[in-house]
């Protein structure tokens, strides 16, 4: 069986491609728009399609013969001024249309854990979360087998959040630093994507988080290997309002949702060690 991954050059995408190849998936097709990312993915063993995620004909052609298609576009880290609908919902609409045209059986998407928290009181007010909630609705209504992976903050090599928290003190912290988080290792998210491809007759929303719940202030200290000075701000430098709002809120597992069967979450200490953050201090 073949599996296709859009957003394959991103934090989760690259880890997912590597995890799927380790699982001996027959063909892993990685979709990227940046020519500079092609060589690295090919070295991993993936077949690479260079096209824009909003190109319906190109995506449908790339999906030919694919059983599972995984959409990893539309992350929180969009460019300043970018419309969340254009960055998140439109690529998902094109992705689902292409999947239907190509006869794809199953789709997998990642969504922020905060989508579930915000949805408890109606549609999310945060534009990024609202866009992700709309994508979840589209996936559920598509008639395709699917897995929606609601992830807490994802940490891994090259994580934008990790770079923010690892900045030279005093560290700019969105919010008051007391918000509770349970960061998940990017390798665990990749393993969940691989599990979703390998599960029979799937239609599920899974909750992905790390096993350790800490305050953001404690996470900053853990990243630095000890207590450091912090500035608590409504919006840290370089963040959009939507990004700062998400980071200033809790990011925890949804107790009403199951963790992917058979997977064991990675402890926070192991996650930070694997990112090499402490080695860079």
List where the protein language model places each region:
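SDR active-site strand-loop-helix element
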Residues: 6, 31, 72-73, 107-113, ...
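NAD(P)H-binding glycine-rich loop region in Rossmannoid oxidoreductase-like domains
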Residues: 33-94, 98, 115-120
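A short helix->loop->beta-strand "cap" motif at the edges of active sites that frequently abuts
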Residues: 25, 101-106, 144
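Short alpha-helix in the Rossmann-fold core of NAD(P)-dependent oxidoreductases
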Residues: 84-92, 108, 132, 182
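Oxidoreductase cofactor-interface core, primarily capturing Rossmann-like NAD(P)-dependent enzymes
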Residues: 23, 117-223
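Mid/C-terminal beta-alpha module of Rossmann-like enzyme folds, strongest
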Residues: 15, 192-243, 253-281
């Amino acid at each position: 069986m073949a599996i296709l991954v859009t957003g394959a050059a991103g934090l989760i995408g690259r880890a997912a491609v590597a995890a799927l190849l380790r699982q001996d998936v027959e063909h892993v097709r990685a979709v990227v728009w940046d020519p500079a990312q092609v060589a690295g993915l090919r070295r991993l063993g993936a077949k690479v399609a260079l096209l824009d995620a909003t190109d319906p004909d190109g995506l449908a052609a790339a999906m030919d013969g694919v059983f599972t298609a995984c959409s990893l576009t539309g992350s929180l880290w969009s460019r300043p001024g970018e419309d969340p609908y254009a960055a998140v919902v439109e690529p998902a609409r094109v992705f689902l249309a292409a999947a239907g045209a190509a006869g794809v059986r199953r789709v997998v998407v990642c969504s922020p854990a905060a989508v579930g928290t915000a949805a408890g009181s109606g549609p999310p007010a945060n534009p990024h979360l609202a866009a992700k909630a709309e994508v979840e609705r589209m996936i559920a209504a598509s008639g395709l087998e699917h897995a929606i992976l609601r992830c807490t903050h994802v940490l891994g090599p090259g994580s934008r959040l990790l770079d923010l928290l690892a900045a030279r003190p005093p560290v700019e912290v969105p919010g008051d630093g007391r918000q509770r988080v349970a960061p998940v290792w990017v390798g665990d998210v990749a393993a969940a994507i691989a599990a979703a491809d390998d599960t029979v007759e799937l239609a599920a929303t899974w909750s992905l988080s790390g096993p350790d719940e800490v305050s953001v202030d404690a996470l900053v200290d853990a990243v630095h290997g000890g207590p450091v000075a912090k500035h608590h701000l409504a919006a840290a430098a370089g963040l959009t309002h939507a990004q700062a709002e998400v980071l200033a809120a809790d990011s925890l597992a949804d107790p009403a949702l199951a963790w992917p069967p058979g997977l064991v979450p990675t402890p926070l200490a192991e996650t930070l060690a694997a990112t090499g953050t402490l080695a860079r201090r």
